[in-house]
Amino acid sequence: MKTPLVGRAATAVALSLATAASLLAGAGTTTSASAAGTDFPQPTVHTQKAYDPEKSDFTARWTRADARQLKAMSDPGAPSRTNSMPSAYTMPEVPQDFPDMSNDKVWVWDSWPLTDEKANQYSVGGWEVIFSLVADRNLGFDDRHVYAKIGYFFRKAGVPAAERPRNGGWTYGGLVFDDGVSGQIFDDKSFSHQTQWSGSARIFKGGEIKLFFTDVAFYRNKDGSDRKPYDPRIAMSPGKIHTNKNGVFFTGFSKVHDMLQADGKWYQNGEQNPYFNFRDPFTFEDPAHPGKTYMVFEGNSAVTRGAKACTEADLGYRPGDPQAETVDEVHEKGAMYQMANIGLAVADNKELTKWHFLPPIHSSNCVTDQTERPQIYMKDGKYYLFTISHRSTFASGIDGPEGVYGFVGDGIRSDYQPMNQGSGLVLGNPTNLNFATGFPFDPDYNQHPGQFQAYSHYVMPGGLVQSFIDTIGTKDDFRRGGTLAPTVKLDIDGSSSSVDYSYGDGGLGGFADIPSDTEFKN
């Protein structure tokens, strides 16, 4: 392979070689386990207590004691190609004959709606609008990450999913940015690739749009090796939405504001780790702190890659737990290479062009290396922190499916409690933890055909969840995706949630169904 894989699922592979190796070593064999509860620790006690988001430096932890509940929930006797995880936390199986929402125009993956400060989803002039990462379909699907651009789609609002075309009825509107615009912010313009990664979009008075995204420059040699670390930055570009009888178009998006770069203090940077994660801005307002706009984003804890930085607090075992590990044991397993966190920032002006970092609100040190696309979701007075992670990015000794992980607390900065039996799992792909992972381009023979069926989930109002299709099928018969998956629905109640199998057809709603719930009015 001449060009190293970079990006979400691909970077996950590169960043977790030790984990992948341990899983591949067990390919074709089952993992012995005793009855659930006998070989696993108790989860860490979390209070859900809220702290001041700006005055406190409290950071919640998803501990190893918490994350080991994932394997405790898995059925050790589940046979080859079946799901070993509880159905209440498992996305229904997506059919392999899925339609393509772009009609073969572009690959589509991470997507997000047009929202306000409360995450309400807007239609404008009778049209629903979404933004997506897209790439030319002449590229191999796994080559898309370094060529990603932000595109947009639109469709008529107010049409029930059952009455739309099977592919969701979207029209591809094209790219948001003209060539060269998003590269303006980089002083060093000798980049080999300049790309755009995920973010969020907010609508304001007069139809002004502020598009928050991750602006990225790669500096590679012809053989694909890096001549210096890649440079991801959290950025924003303003534009304006227009509609007519034919659809949606935009003006603006000609200037990019360079807002945040990983600081090396709270958020790992390229000097500390050339493979660091820093991306996926999601902005919102908090009713408990009126007049403030906050942002959550994906980061890594600011330590030098490979430093033995796991702590007792990261492990989180209760005193005297017979299944507890020691810090030395965890370091010997190589878990210090997985150091994910979720960052927080606050806007310094009303234009939302200037921000400053606050301490992270959540860490997964020695548990996983990626907590992607974080978002704050509010319901019944509770604050839910949702994020996504790959099976391949979990640290040695931790295992769980690809999908959505959730945590609940009483404020933005809380002692977040992992949902669902203390595990954090909210919506996983059907997966068999008794067998190796494989890769989206080469599934393990024994894995469930849905192990890679969906990723990059976004939780919408009413508990609806959208995602994109990666790979569906078995090693001897699989199909790659590059389009949006069926929408599913979660029933969320306190620290628990479950998949609503009465929604749609056996729990699967329409493909690419991202409905608006609010009509924009100037």
Question: How should these model regions be labeled?
Answer:
Residues S22-T38:
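C-terminal region of N-terminal signal peptides and the immediate post-cleavage residues
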Residues M1-A14:
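Bacterial Sec-dependent N-terminal signal peptides
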Residues R8, S16, G26-G28:
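Low-complexity intrinsically disordered segments
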Residues G37-N522:
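Carbohydrate-active catalytic/glycan-binding domains of CAZyme proteins
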Residues V13-L23:
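Classical Sec-dependent N-terminal signal peptides that target proteins to the secretory pathway
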